[in-house]
Structures are given as C-alpha cells and as structure tokens.
Amino acid sequence: MLAASPKGTVPVLVLANGEVIDESIDIMRWALEQKDPEGWMASFEPGLLADYDSAFKHHLDRYKYAARYGEDPLAHRAAGLAMLLQLDAQLADRGYLGGNVRGFADIAIFPFVRQFAGVDPAWFEAEAPRNLRGWLDRLISSDVFERAMVRRTLWTADEI
C-alpha cells in the first residue's frame, strides 16, 4: 500500500493504468462514474461533503480520540452537534439529504455520523436531533450497509 500511496492511509485504489486514487470521496466518485444504479451522483454536493470531510472530521477525531489530542472532548462534541443540527434541518421534510431517496451525500457523510454516535450512544440517543437519528437508523438498517458490513473471520498469516 505504501508503494502506491505514501500517505499510508486507507482506502487506496490503484487503477489498471497505474493511477492511484487515495481519497474516499474520489474513490466513490470514480466507482459511480463506472456504474451508478441508484443515481447517487445526482445528489453530489461538493460543499457539504467538504464540510464533513474536514471540519466535522476534525471535531469527530478530537471527540472520539480525546486522549490522543489532549483537547476537551465535550467542546468538540458540541461543535459536531452544531453541524449535525444543520443536517437535521435539511432532513426536516425529506428522508435523505438529497431528497426522498438516498444518494451520494448520505453515503459519504453517514459513516462520520455513525462514528460520532458511537462515542457515547446514550448521549447521542438523548441529545441528537430526531430527524438525524431517523436518517442514521435508515442508513444503518439498509440493505447496502448490511451487505457492506458483513463480519468476516480474521485473516491470519497461516492461511497463505
């Protein structure tokens, strides 16, 4: 992996022509350019995605991994919640961020929200806005998520 992308982070996609794509959003876009059976690209919102991939991720990391950063996790939880309130407002009259069907923005953003919810599930259930919780529940219980998150047995070197 390091030979393909010196960043040393996942995911990394190496195309047949040798091109390397090492950003999640770019990999999603590439895959959907190949095949987009549910029309997710129709709801592609670069500004919203950039906010969650940068500002929200910043707060998520400092909330989830507070000991690593030495910062007040509650301040970052509050900042993250403020951003989630904006998503909740978008979800007030529709089931998904782009309308009544899931799309690119939903699939790209919900893993961050899922991680945020997982830091303190009881707090999230009590404090996160209702529309947002419903949206997260719909995505977590979706067929797409369940297929992607099948638990596999741990691979060991003995299996070579």
Please report, for each region that a protein language model flagged, where it lies by residue.
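GST-like domain detector, emphasizing the conserved glutathione-binding G-site
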Residues: 1-82, 88, 92
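Hydrophobic/aromatic-lined pockets within catalytic cores
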Residues: 32-36, 68, 92, 112-113, ...
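Structural helix-adjacent loops and short alpha-helical linkers that scaffold large soluble proteins
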Residues: 37-39, 122-128
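Residues lining hydrophobic/aromatic ligand-binding pockets adjacent to catalytic sites
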Residues: 66, 70-75, 95-98, 125-127, ...
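Extended, well-ordered alpha-helical scaffold segments
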Residues: 75-83, 127-141
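Surface-exposed helix-capping loop/turn segments at secondary-structure junctions
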Residues: 89-100, 144-148
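GST superfamily/GST-like fold recognition
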Residues: 97-122
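Long, charge-rich low-complexity segments
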Residues: 147, 151-160
